[in-house]
Amino acid sequence: SSDLSPEQKNEVYRRVRDGEVDLFYLSPELLLAYDISYFVGERRIGLVVVDEAHTVTTWGKEFRVDYWFLGRHLEALKNALGYVFPVFALTATAVWNPKGGNDMIFDTIRSLHLAPCALYVGTVKRENIGFDITAMTIEEGETYDKAKQRTVAARVEDFLDGHKTIIYYPFAGGIDMKLKTWVYPANWHWVASYYGKKDKEQKAEIIQAFKEGEKKIIVATKAFGMGVDISDIDRVYHVAPSGTFVDYIQEIGRAARDKNISGVAATDFNERDFYYMKRLHSAGAISQEQLGMILKKVWEIYLMKGCSDEMQMSLSDFEFAVRLPRKKNKLEYESDLEQVIKTALLWIEEDLSFRHGGSPVEINSQTLFADGYVQEKTGDAAFRKKYKQYMVPVEGVEGVYKVAFESLWENCFSEMGYREFKRDLYNGNLFEGVRAAVVGKHDVLLKESAADICFKLASLLKSLKDLLTVSLYGNKGKFEEDDLRSIFAAYDMDVPSAKRFITSLLESRVEEGRSVSYITSAKKKDEDKLMFTVTRGFDLLLSRYQKLCAQRITGKKGGRLLFYVTPFSDLNMLLNLLSMLNVVDFTVEGGVPSVGVRVHDAEILKKEATSGSYQNRVLENNEKIFQEQIELFRLFFGNTKLSDEQRWEFIEDYFTGMNLEGLKEKYSCVVECRLCKV
């Protein structure tokens, strides 16, 4: 658990290895990060339990990809250990729909490699939970936001009168401010907020206070729920629909765990509530264009590595395609990057398998951080002597060593957790008295001569500088995405590519230990286009990249360059920008974790990667399911006349495979019939 310190974790692992502990809880991410012997030593595994197994096919396909990789990892583990252990998967909310696109049960069985298996099906109905679902009214002259604030505040007053309540709000950002607009100051002491970024001590205190009745209401994101066992919650209120209907059923199921209590799931619904759902969906979304770029990059790396069937691909190789905000905490940024890239590669693997059969491309479940490079510029002899068993000098490069990171950690820094080891390694604080930093080996292929590359970049940066300067002084820094069209057309780049280039160049940088951004963007009203706002200082940054290109990019077309630099340095970003301009290809080894990729059919990979029109069916299906979820909530919340019994029947119909059209036919009719009788 993340609540334990590194020392506490190591003590737990020791107790498991020594046979003092027989039941051991850990996350899929932790299981996939280490050799199994690190946890259990020489002991045999008797049983693996996958609790909340619906997360395998929900979280696993979106934001915690190691859940999806769990099954193949367990299968590989059985092969490596030479014996079989049973796997027991449990969930209260999985959709049974073997012929539909939203099946979760058989998808989970497939993902976890459970077949053949015994399948036990219970009921989703909770007879002691009723519903209070109304249509939110917006009064004359009132905005949606004001109406929502008034409605939730009235609910809060009711909930404070003798109830224990969870209020679910979709966004962590601003949740504390919202809380204060919903609750009178005199009642603030009865209410607490709960979301993922609160520290573990705060979370524990909030849960304990809620359990003991010192807090009557928790305003929470979906982070509150799993693993929290409080039996006397009697109200669950949703400010807006959950991310999925399955999430909604999970969340209302936290009410009335004590069967002697009557719980109520409440919502005041308005059509504009779907804004929250859509914003959450788009926040971490991967586009078809990005998937196409990542697939193309896999093909380019395959060629650069001599068409090797098995390759390690650094997360940095794909950084240009996803454009995540840079963070001061490099490990957090790396973790975000890992989730997005592994998810994208998983979707590509699934799609190619679906289209062509077999496994044209196979992604390894584990992210490796076994070997890498460290640069120590002072030439400290004592440092070299102390760690020579784990470090080999790189020939021809002064002060750079190839390092067996895992062996170094296990033998010299095992008192630290692996995450803390990586943090200090990244920050140059691992080796006492020595400034030794992690660097990545950047292997660069010039697709044009260095002179042509530098000229092309300089010309583009000058055109951008002219646009940004005019915008800054003539239009309060604002310009539209269409303004980029004519500039980037000369470099064979369309508007989406132009947006990616300029935001990578100017957005979310870390300078002198702080996050800075020279550009922001927002959607134009009633248009699916962006309006950008640029701030002062961009010209110095453009000049810096132009000079860096002239200094470091040398040689003829087809030449190779080798750089050892930190993963998120200016040179690394320059190479990403040049890659977007299609004037270099490059790969990174070491510095950041890598993903193993095995190519079983290079012809299929080439065909799809170079087609220029790749469309990923997994993403298409995800989008279809998302739209169906909106329709599902619209039907469930919009029909305010449904009785509690009918709502639970609706839920059971959905979980046992009735499709959206069937639900519409059955429950629209139910409402109409009831209205007719009235």
Regions found by a protein language model. Give the residues of each.
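Conserved helix/coil segment N-terminal to the catalytic DExD/H
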Residues: L4-L47, T57-K61
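Structural recognition of the conserved hydrophobic beta-strand(s) that form the central parallel beta-sheet
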Residues: F24-L26, L47-V50, P86-T91, I217-A220
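Walker B catalytic acidic pair
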Residues: P28, E52, F171
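Catalytic P-loop NTPase motifs of RecA-like helicase/translocase cores
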Residues: L31-L32, T55-E62, W96-N97, G227, ...
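Post-DEXD/H (motif II) to motif III coupling segment of the RecA-like Helicase ATP-binding lobe
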Residues: G41-E42, G46-L47, H54-V121
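Inter-lobe coupling/hinge segments of SF2-like helicase ATPases
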Residues: R126-E142
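C-terminal helicase lobe
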Residues: G141, R155-F224, V228-V678
